[in-house]
Amino acid sequence: MAQNGTGGGSRRPRRGRRNNNNNNSTARDKALLALTQQVNRLANIASSSAPSLQHPTFIASKKCRAGYTYTSLDVRPTRTEKDKSFGQRLIIPVPVSEYPKKKVSCVQVRLNPSPKFNSTIWVSLRRLDETTLLTSENVFKLFTDGLAAVLIYQHVPTGIQPNNKITFDMSNVGAEIGDMGKYALIVYSKDDVLEADEMVIHIDIEHQRIPSLQRSRCDSTRMHDVRRR
């Protein structure tokens, strides 16, 4: 019996060592998880400014409908003070603009922040009268009248906010390519100065194909090589 007692006592340190090993393993797992999260954040920041199949993400989010393609625009907001707004009308390049009667089905807006971005902005797309001036005073009220969806995008400590795009359905208003100049992208800088190099906004306009774009770029197998014509 004494020997059994001694044997039982000798096993206790081994159980303790196993517990220590488990604790060490848990600590290593936590450290590895933290490192993985940090690497993923850095990868997200790096990929946000590098061309890829996700850039712009219209292709990744959905395919064009049959008979449609898309035209991409890049908007770089100028320096915008806190509580001030920026606006820019959609200017369609040639040869697409030479076919004003082609239908537009939707417009997708995607935000691509630089690593320096650390504030909150509101973004929307509005149809405005040609006489409307896109000054800060005129633009701000467009975010609060409830007549259009607004994307609220903010810096988060863990990395880039995943909800960085918004799609506006244009088919229900019968929009055409010739109407796009009546629409403006508007940006409101809510809680800090938005510097000129902190944000690029990609706009993908899905519209009926035109003769010079025989092949839909949404269906191309080399999407990352296609440039806006």
From Swiss-Prot:
Keywords: Acetylation, Capsid protein, Disulfide bond, Ribonucleoprotein, RNA-binding, T=3 icosahedral capsid protein, Viral nucleoprotein, Virion. Residues 1-10 have a biased composition (Gly residues). The keyword RNA-binding applies. Residues 1-28 are annotated as: Disordered. Its main location: virion. Disulfide bonds join C64-C106. The N-terminal arginine-rich stretch does not seem to be the major RNA-binding region that allows formation of an infectious ribonucleoprotein complex. Belongs to the cucumovirus capsid protein family. This is Capsid protein.
